[in-house]
Amino acid sequence: MSKVLVLKSSIMAQHSHTNQMADFFIEKWQTNHADDSITVRDLTAQSIPALDNELVHALRPSGNEMTARQKETLALSDELIAELQDNDVIVITAPMYNFHIPTQLKSYFDMIARAGVTFRYTENGPEGLLKGKQVIILTSRGGIHKDGPSDLLVPYLRLFLSFIGLTDIEFVFTEGVALGPDAANQAQQTAREVLQAIAS
C-alpha cells in the first residue's frame, strides 16, 4: 500500500485548472489503487507564514528561548516535514503566477528546507534526505511557456526538490488556458490523458 500526499497551492479554488487536474488524478488513483491512502493539504486554506527575521531563527535552533511565534512555526515545520517523510507519492499543484510559483508554495518550501532534517552538508556538497519518493507536479499556464526562456518554474522546482532529495519528478502541463475555450479544453484533455496513464 502506498501513501499519496496532494499539495494544492492555487488561489483560484474551484476555478483552478491545477486543482481540477489534481481532483482528476485523485479520482483515477483511487480507482486503480483502492488500498492506498490519499492526504490532501490545501496550502491556501492554512496560513503558512512567510519567513522573517524572527521566524527564520525558529528553523535554526540556537538553544535560546523561543517566542510563541517561533514555537508555532517550528511545530508547523515539523508537521509538514513529517507528512512528507510519511508519504510515498507527492503531487504538487504549481500554477504559473507572474512566471513563478504561488507565494503559498514558496512559503511551504521555506518551511520544509531545514539543514540536518531534509538536507545536510557533506564534504562532497549538499545531500538531500527525502529520498525514494515519486513527485508529480501539475502546472498550468495562461500562455505557452514549456521549454522556453520564460519557463522559470520548471528549473526552479527541479533544483529545489532535488536539493532535498526528491529527484524522481514528472511534470504534467496544462498550457494555453487563457488562449480561448478550445485551447483550454485541449490542454485539459491532454493533461488528463497523461494523468490517467500515471495513475494506472
Swiss-Prot record:
Pfam families: Flavodoxin_2. Keywords: Flavoprotein, FMN, NAD, Oxidoreductase. One of its GO terms (molecular function) is FMN binding. SUPFAM superfamilies: Flavoproteins. Binds 1 FMN per subunit. It is an enzyme of class 1 (oxidoreductase). FMN binds at residues 10, 96-99, 140-143. Its cofactor is FMN. InterPro entries: Flavodoxin_fold, Flavoprotein-like_sf, FMN-dep_NADH:Q_OxRdtase_AzoR1, NADH:quinone_OxRdtase_FMN_depd. The keyword Membrane does not apply. It catalyses: 2 a quinone + NADH + H(+) = 2 a 1,4-benzosemiquinone + NAD(+); N,N-dimethyl-1,4-phenylenediamine + anthranilate + 2 NAD(+) = 2-(4-dimethylaminophenyl)diazenylbenzoate + 2 NADH + 2 H(+). Its EC number is 1.6.5.-, 1.7.1.17. Belongs to the azoreductase type 1 family. Homodimer. PANTHER family: FMN-DEPENDENT NADH-AZOREDUCTASE 1, FMN-DEPENDENT NADH:QUINONE OXIDOREDUCTASE. Quinone reductase that provides resistance to thiol-specific stress caused by electrophilic quinones. Also exhibits azoreductase activity. Catalyzes the reductive cleavage of the azo bond in aromatic azo compounds to the corresponding amines. This is FMN-dependent NADH:quinone oxidoreductase. It comes from Photorhabdus laumondii subsp. laumondii (strain DSM 15139 / CIP 105565 / TT01).
